Amino acid sequence: QLSIKDAIEKYCIRKVITFHKSVAAASSFTAHGPEGIEAHVPALQAFHVNGNMASGKRDPIMRAFAEGERTLISNARCLTEGVDVPAVDMVAFLTPKRSLVDIVQATGRAMRTSESTNKTTGYVLVPLFLEQVEGETIEEAVARAQFDEVWAGLQALQEHDEVLAEIILHMREERGRTKGFNDQDLQGRVEVFGPSVSLDTLRHAISAQIVDQIGSNWDERFGELVAFNAQHGDCNVPRHWPEQRGL
């Protein structure tokens, strides 16, 4: 809930859909009371729908969500493709959602534009829970963590954002050429925020994993070949060249 609160305040979010694994989790998230999201975000109206609801009950809730000034709706097994949903500013995957098709469809809802607003940016939020053991660096903790939802979300975003796909391609190629990369361009697409850790260190560690998990191995090998050509004047890499065995 705190990550949702921070994102809403930072990016002036007006409409949010949250995705949950179970009806109980979704309903609890938007419950009216101290445990619900409304208790943390002033002037927010929270709603809930799920796949067990009849359309006669769900439709008025969806209208209220669409017509409200600042609204959030939680759902479980409901707001998939084919269900009429208004344009939203952000979708949030608050529990694991493994189907790539579902993730692509959900992120598409955040990417949709609306004639009634001046919206230019859609947001996808995925909370990260990072456990750092004693003596472990943040980079090591990120490498060990299972951030499958992040990688799936970024894979889905590439379906809607060609610039993101191009940025990741160039980062992988740059790492092949220079043994490192500059993630400044990625910061405009992927932002990390939260308490208690060095966010720059965490961001760079996550960027490295993005390059590994989302980028193409071919692009990195191409970068290595570019570096070899710059050093030797040709692309005739010896079969057992020790510096980049991948070539």
PLM regions and their residue ranges:
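Helix N-cap/beta->alpha junction signal
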Residues: 20-24, 76
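Conserved interdomain linker/interface between the two RecA-like ATPase lobes of SF2 helicase motors
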Residues: 1-21
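Conserved RecA-like P-loop NTPase helicase motor core
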Residues: 47-168
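Conserved helicase motor "Helicase C" RecA-like lobe of SF1/SF2 P-loop NTPases
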Residues: 23-48
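Short, well-ordered amphipathic alpha-helices
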Residues: 2-4, 27-35, 105-111
